[in-house]
A protein has these predicted regions:
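ATP/nucleoside-binding phosphotransfer catalytic cores, i.e., glycine-rich phosphate-binding loops
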Residues: 276-339
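Short, acidic/small-residue loops that bind anionic groups at enzyme active sites
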Residues: 131-153, 161-168, 301
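ATP/NTP phosphate-donor binding region
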Residues: 33-109
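N-terminal secretory signal peptides that target proteins for export/translocation
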Residues: 1-13
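Internal helical hairpin/lid segments
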Residues: 232-287
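Conserved anion/nucleotide-ligand pocket segment
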Residues: 160-220
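Bacterial N-terminal signal peptides
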Residues: 17-28
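Buried hydrophobic positions in well-ordered alpha/beta secondary-structure cores of metabolic enzymes
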Residues: 52, 113, 146, 221, ...
Length: 339
């Protein structure tokens, strides 16, 4: 009898130890899943140095317009090795392109890093960035299109606000709207309204919502799914844009986001211009039908036709910044994108 009692006592102790282990494990996983705190980079001022890189496709056409604009604003410009490098279609080898980014974040004299071109290639280097280094040396990091991969990864891994911002082609005869958006995002330390720069957007669904902005180019957002760098949309405002995609492809990507649970708990949607989206067959859905089919039953504010991405003018969007949408006031208020 005594032996049975001893055994029962040991089993009970083992159960307690097991339950404690499970609790600690779950607590650890919960802590790991928590998003890092927001890190707001310092704003630009005349005399600051901006690093130019080509982390995706090689430079190709001239980036003179961007350089001239930055110099005219009183900024200094330095060039990464990738700026004039070429390896296949990329701005140098994966090593060169990743090292450019790591080196520029480590360089205390460089206050911002601007990408000059998208295309393809950032997914090849996303796992080669030193995210701890980036977190400890926060600064403006900007680009769009294929750069979406890095904008999301850096923001998700470090909490640093990144920028879905203009690249070389956007600086050629720069529209006033683009310049105003540039100034607010990169130099103004106050809150501002993303919708103040251009009134060509429309309201698809009225409402109010609040959360961090995340997103970028739709193809690259979808490409992040299932990876260590997967987009986190929970409790956030989703911004997506695309260019020259058939409407059935847009529909497929939106369905993939939905099936992955990425539309489940979002607080608002900002739809970009989706320039060049056309039916590939006569019986394909129109872009408007695709949006209605995917978002029609959602009870959140939705704005469409927002000018950011593969379009002129271009309004810079701070990825990871706190924002409030109020369609009744025609506002997307950015709390702060730089300090």
């Amino acid at each position: 009898m005594k032996n049975l009692i001893d055994i029962a006592g040991k089993v009970s102790s083992i159960k307690k130890i097991f339950l404690i282990f499970v609790f600690v494990l779950i607590s650890g996983l919960t802590l790991q899943a928590e998003a890092p705190a927001i890190i707001i980079p310092e704003g630009l001022k005349p005399g600051d140095t901006i690093g130019l890189i080509a982390p995706a496709n090689y430079k190709g056409t001239s980036a003179d317009a961007e350089v001239e604009y930055l110099l005219s604003r009183g900024f200094n410009v330095v060039y990464g090795r990738s700026y004039d490098s070429r390896w296949y279609g990329f701005g140098g080898t994966d090593y060169i392109r990743a090292k450019d980014i790591n080196d520029m974040f480590a360089n205390k004299n460089i206050k911002a890093i601007f990408s000059i071109r998208g295309g393809y290639g950032t997914i090849r280097i996303v796992d080669k960035l030193d995210y701890d280094l980036i977190r400890k040396n926060p600064k403006i990091f900007s680009g769009f299109s294929d750069l979406t991969t890095l904008l999301l990864a850096i923001n998700e891994k470090t909490g640093l606000v990144t920028f879905h911002g203009p690249m070389s082609s956007n600086f050629d005869k720069i529209p006033e709207t683009t310049e105003n958006g540039f100034n607010k995002a990169f130099t103004d330390k106050q809150s501002y309204n993303l919708l103040e720069f251009d009134d060509s957007y429309s309201i698809m669904k009225s409402g109010r919502g609040e959360g961090k902005i995340t997103g970028g180019n739709l193809s690259l957002v979808v490409a992040s799914l299932g990876t260590e760098y997967e987009i986190n949309t929970d409790g956030k405002i989703l911004f997506i844009e695309e260019v020259n995609e058939a409407t059935y492809r847009v529909d497929r990507m939106l369905k993939q986001l939905k099936l992955a649970g990425k539309l489940k708990n979002i607080k608002g949607i900002i739809l970009g211009d989706f320039k060049g989206a056309k039916r590939s067959e006569l019986d394909d859905m129109s872009l408007e039908d695709v949006f209605i089919d995917n978002f029609g039953d959602m009870k959140i504010p939705i704005i469409k036709g927002f000018k950011s991405g593969h379009v002129r003018p271009f309004i810079t969007v701070p990825i990871g910044a706190n924002a409030k949408i109020d369609t009744y006031k025609n506002e997307i208020i950015i709390e702060k994108s730089v300090k």
